[in-house]
Amino acid sequence: MKIAADIRQTGSDHFDGYTSFLYRLLEIVAAKNPGHEFIFISGRPMQTKLLFDNNVTVVITGPQIRNILLRKIWYDIKIPALLRKYKADVFIAANGICSLNTSCPLCLIVNDLSFLHFSSPIKKASLFFLKRETKKFLDTANIIVTFSEFVKKEIVLKFAISEEKITVVPPAGKESFYPLDENEKEEIKKKYTGGKNYFIYTGVIHPQKNLINLLKAFSVFKKRQKSDWKLVLAGSLDKSYKNFANNVKSYKYRNDVLMMACSEEEAVRLTGAAYAFIYPSFYEGNGAAVLDAINSHIPVITSFNSSMQEIAGDAALYVDPADHNDIADKMMLLYKDESLRNSLIEKGKIVAAQYNLEKTADLFWQSILKAYPAPGKNLK
């Protein structure tokens, strides 16, 4: 079987959580199924070191999507042509958008429906496109894959899609995240924060991630505790949020904030050496970033909304993302209570054992097979 996938969102050297998880998921699926051919399609050169096996062909082609017209060319002309050229049996649309101009069986990945809840950073033309076309994409798909029950329920309720059409593939923290020993932690802290303890956020720097409220919470923490602790924001700056860098430059505690784009290797080490991971996002379709932190054996503070509680269970402290004082209170609670911190780490180990990237890849592969309607073929 030939499986084509749109991987435009993956492969950057800059770590941003979801796309890194998706890249690794596709990588494992291809490696575990050497008898099938994979065609990974991207609109830009792949920056990440390619670890794909010989059964993977990476196709780099334009146009890069910068506006609605180029998006239409990509999905309605370029993608159908490539699917015909490579005689694809299944097409994986990895970002919730697909071509409506092909008969190729479709596995549609819907990570979230954030455009319905947090539309302000989205250009009006793109927002109009998503609101108008998403129902068509969902109806067209042979199988829909999400990474949480939360998103599945949203799809069913808001777009009247049958539950039977939707498969929930649980997320998993990447195996590259692991607990550091004390010497490694001290080495990382010395390198990045002058030996000081720090809270960390990893992921794309984007309005949806609620980092302004995180800065406000850190201000409250600094005022109340009079501590020398730092805040690390590790991730690439979204092009829609360039003014955030200026906010950090004028921030009262700017000398205690480290904002940096980083590779996944750096994110692993920075996360493992942190005192706690803070993820106060307004909306999330999956908890992969939280699971990365849990795998690193550090405690988690995250939002009570969307999919976070579904994923982290009792292994996290939960906050109202709209209330920076609530975020600050949880930071101070961990700062003061070492036994609570240790308890969350131990609970995290139990949660981490429930998620496995190999198992996630197997479930995803079964979803791909469901999208392929040809009768009488053994695709195991």
PLM features per residue range, with description:
Residues M1-K380:
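Carbohydrate transferase catalytic cores enriched for Leloir-type hexosyltransferases
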